[in-house]
C-alpha cells in the first residue's frame, strides 16, 4: 500500500459506521507515515495525537493527547499543570482544585471521552512511533490503559503508528499478545506516495518526496 492511501484509512476509521475501532499503520522509517497523518488530521476534530518518541511516562503520553484535544496545538514538551489548568471540567472543577498537583491528565481525558460518548460523537486518538517507546514507560501498562479506554468508550477510535520491524523484545512479545486481542486491522505501507496533495506544484511534490526518501 502507498503512503498516500493513509488519509483513506483515517477517514474509514473515523466513520461512525466503520467496523474498526483500532487499527495499526506500519511502515519503514522515512516512508511518509507521520507526514501523511499530520497533514490529514489538521482538518479533523476532535483528534488527540502523541508521538511516543522521547516521552518518558504514561502521564506525559496522556498529557500530550489531552493538550492536543483541548488546545489543538502540537508541542513536543507538555507542562502537565498547564494542561490541567486549561481543561474545563464543568461540575468537576472543585475536584480538580482539591486534587491540585495530583490531578491526572488521564482523569481529564476520561471526562472528555465521556462527554463525546454521551453525544454519540467519535473521538480519534493517535499514538505514533510506538516502537520508539522509552524503556522508562511500562509498555504493557500503556497498552492495557488504551485497551480499557476502548472497552469503556465505544466512540473512541485508536490509531497506532509504528515500524513493526523495529520492535524488539520484550516489547515485541507484549505487542503481539495485545494486538491479537484488540487491533482490528494492520495496514502495511510499503511505498512512498506518488504525490503529496497538500503541496501546490509538481516541483514541491518532487522535493518533498526526495526529502522523505532520505529521512
Please place each PLM-identified region on the residue numbering.
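Conserved small helical "lid"/interfacial subdomain of P-loop NTPases
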Residues: 181-214
Amino acid at each position: 500500500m502507498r503512503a498516500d492511501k493513509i488519509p483513506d484509512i483515517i477517514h474509514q476509521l473515523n466513520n461512525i459506521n466503520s467496523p474498526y475501532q483500532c487499527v495499526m499503520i506500519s511502515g519503514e522509517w522515512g516512508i511518509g507515515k507521520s507526514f501523511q497523518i499530520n497533514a490529514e488530521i489538521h482538518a479533523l476534530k476532535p483528534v488527540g495525537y502523541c508521538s511516543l518518541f522521547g516521552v518518558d511516562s504514561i502521564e506525559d503520553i496522556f498529557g500530550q493527547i489531552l493538550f492536543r484535544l483541548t488546545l489543538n496545538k502540537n508541542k513536543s514538551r507538555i507542562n502537565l499543570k498547564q494542561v490541567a489548568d486549561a481543561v474545563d471540567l464543568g461540575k468537576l472543577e472543585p475536584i480538580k482544585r482539591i486534587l491540585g498537583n495530583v490531578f491526572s491528565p488521564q482523569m481529564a481525558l476520561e471526562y472528555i471521552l465521556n462527554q463525546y460518548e454521551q453525544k454519540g460523537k467519535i473521538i480519534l486518538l493517535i499514538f505514533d512511533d510506538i516502537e520508539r517507546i522509552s524503556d522508562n514507560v511500562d509498555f504493557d501498562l500503556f497498552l492495557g490503559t488504551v485497551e480499557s479506554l476502548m472497552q469503556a468508550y465505544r466512540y473512541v477510535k485508536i490509531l497506532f503508528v509504528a515500524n513493526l520491524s523495529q520492535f524488539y523484545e520484550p516489547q515485541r512479545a507484549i505487542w503481539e499478545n495485545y494486538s491479537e486481542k484488540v487491533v482490528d486491522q494492520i495496514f502495511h505501507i510499503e511505498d512512498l506516495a506518488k504525490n503529496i496533495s497538500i503541496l501546490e506544484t509538481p516541483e514541491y511534490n518532487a522535493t518533498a518526496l526526495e526529502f522523505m526518501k532520505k529521512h
